[in-house]
Amino acid sequence: MRLILVRHGETLWNEQHKFQGISDIELSPKGMSQAKKLAESLKEEALAKIYTSPLIRARQTAEQIARYHDCQVIIVEDLKELNQGRLEGLTVEELHRDFPDFLKNWIHNTESAQLPEGESLGELQSRAWAAILRMKEEHPKDTVAAVAHSFVNLTILCRILEIPLQQFRKLRQEAAAKSLIEFTEKGTILRGLNDTCHLSRI
């Protein structure tokens, strides 16, 4: 399987540096432009299916990709972003002010630290990777796209690169970025990471 792993376009909360999590925030005008450019960059791909998180910012991005392809858009609950609980809607400054104990735990126990009334990264990785394996089983020889979120994609990439979640901060997933992963009989290959060349004119 060739997997094109996509992050959704930008939202107003992204621009305001707020934690989104599972809050259902639409693409901003800039984010919609990014999604359209991303879709154009994928129009020559022979996509068997487009999978997407149920959150609207991902679905809007997937719908733009689908304009160029005669294939289904499938909603996958396990591609939903990390449930960030009480952190959702906060800025980084508010996080540091209101949840200093959580931050200390997050830094030292990144995989297992439970977000206040939310998930841990380990829990997210388990469900997101299970979704990828289901795609691989259904499409062993196909190219598919999966539209998800920053933390979702980062945990998938950590699994592919066989690095601990503690190291996720060394990776980036920009708005409307795409990464290319190939699953072969000999192993998994990361062919492209966080590609945003298609956004150069926005």
Predicted segments — roles?
Residues 39-103:
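Phosphate-coordination/substrate-recognition cap region in phosphate-metabolizing enzymes
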Residues 15-18, 101-115:
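Short, basic/glycine-rich phosphate-binding loops at helix/coil junctions
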Residues 1-4, 49:
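Extreme N-terminal starter segment of soluble prokaryotic enzymes
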Residues 10-64, 68, 115-129:
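Loop-to-helix element that buttresses phosphate recognition and phosphoryl-transfer chemistry
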Residues 3, 142-150:
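Generic beta-sheet signal
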Residues 71, 75, 82-96, 137, ...:
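Acidic, low-complexity terminal tails and accessory targeting/binding regions
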Residues 11, 152-153:
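Short active-site segment of divalent metal-dependent hydrolases/proteases
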